[in-house]
A protein has these predicted regions:
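Catalytic cores and adjacent flexible loops of soluble metabolic enzymes
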Residues: 1-346
């Protein structure tokens, strides 16, 4: 099994502060992620001055400013992104960013970005999808979130990507709910199983906006190949996404939990594992003498019983042994041996 690709979604939780963003890269590395992801945008190209805030944004940032004014404060200048990109790579992390406008697509293309994350809000943006699909970048991978979308809408977006030359094997579809945070009853992990059936030619992942790290860990047995999770250094920081993000400690628990579950999945066939083999002799039982038995005596339910250890004749041969004559003397608790009866393998 290929390890799940874990992405720490820094997004705009740096609040436009380069030093905060750099510290977040450090914490993501400590947590054990494979990559960090940012959001690249020019607020004036992304949001109209008439666009309202989302309900969750109003809840955490108030309604005194517009969505546009709020988002302007979260921009990360291109030159600072380049520095963060280089810094993250120096730590051994992959780094990529989601573009939200055409200028930002061009900028990230100039950086020869390999992984292109299409956010849920751009799923039905035809010119946006076409532009990313047509980028002449070698080994380009596309990851597409599906929050707020129906299955038919997802198929429409995938058709645009495929019609513009992107192979299904180079696309990862992320199950996603765009409510921040997503109520557990709306997470719908079973949708991942549905995706694996409907979109069997594609890679399937999970963009988790639910509280904590529980759903992320629980998604592993569904066969995901990619997971992203928003994280923050402090859930009380000003900004729209902090309260729906995990802390560095929670991010580490997510990473550790994912890796532990990956190792735990194992085989569909029930096997005796190397780690438990040594316990067979300790935990299983054998047929033993229940009292002193003289050579020639018949084995009966009175003079034999079953006790540990499990390296003698198996109790599964109980009725076969009854009525047989002892071939030697046995002391109480001594393992019974008899011609034709093998000792258990341990």
């Amino acid at each position: 099994m290929t390890s799940i690709y874990i992405v720490a979604e820094i997004g705009c939780n740096h609040n436009g502060d380069f030093q905060l963003a750099k510290k977040m890269v450090d914490e993501a590395k400590k947590a054990g992620v494979d990559a960090v992801k940012f959001q690249t945008f020019k607020a004036d190209q992304l949001i109209s001055k008439y666009a309202p805030k989302a309900e969750y944004q109003i809840k955490v940032t108030g309604n005194d400013e517009s969505q546009l004014d709020m988002t302007r404060k979260l921009e990360l200048p291109y030159d600072e992104f380049i520095k963060l990109e280089e810094y993250a790579k120096s730590l051994g992390l992959d780094v990529f960013s989601t573009p939200f406008d055409f200028d930002s697509i061009d900028f990230l293309a100039s950086r020869l970005q390999k992984v292109w994350k299409i956010p849920s809000g751009e799923l039905l943006n035809l010119p946006y999808l076409e532009k990313i699909a047509r980028l002449p970048i070698e080994d380009k991978k596309i990851v597409i979130s599906t929050g707020m979308a129906t299955t038919e809408e997802i198929k429409m977006a995938l058709k645009v990507l495929r019609d513009n030359g992107v192979m299904a094997s180079d696309i990862t579809i992320l199950h996603c709910n765009t409510e921040y945070p997503t109520p557990f009853e709306d997470v719908n992990l079973n949708t991942i199983a549905g995706f694996k059936n409907i979109f069997s030619d594609y890679n399937i992942g999970f963009s988790d906006h639910s509280p904590g790290y529980f759903a992320g860990i629980a998604s592993v047995p569904y066969g995901i190949t990619f997971i992203e999770k928003h994280f923050t250094l402090n859930k009380d920081f000003e900004g729209p996404d902090h309260k729906a993000s995990v802390t560095p400690d929670e991010l580490k628990l997510l990473c550790d939990g994912i890796r532990a579950v990956e190792r735990s999945l194992g085989s569909f066939e029930k096997l005796v594992t190397p780690s438990e083999r040594k316990n067979k002799i300790v935990a299983r039982k054998s047929i033993v003498a229940n009292c002193k038995i003289k050579k020639g005596e018949m084995f009966t339910t009175e003079n034999i019983t079953t006790k540990r250890p499990g390296n003698g004749i198996s109790p599964m041969y109980w009725y076969d042994l009854l009525g047989q004559a002892a071939e030697r003397d046995f002391e109480e608790d001594q393992l019974v041996v008899h011609t034709g009866f093998k000792e258990q393998e341990v």
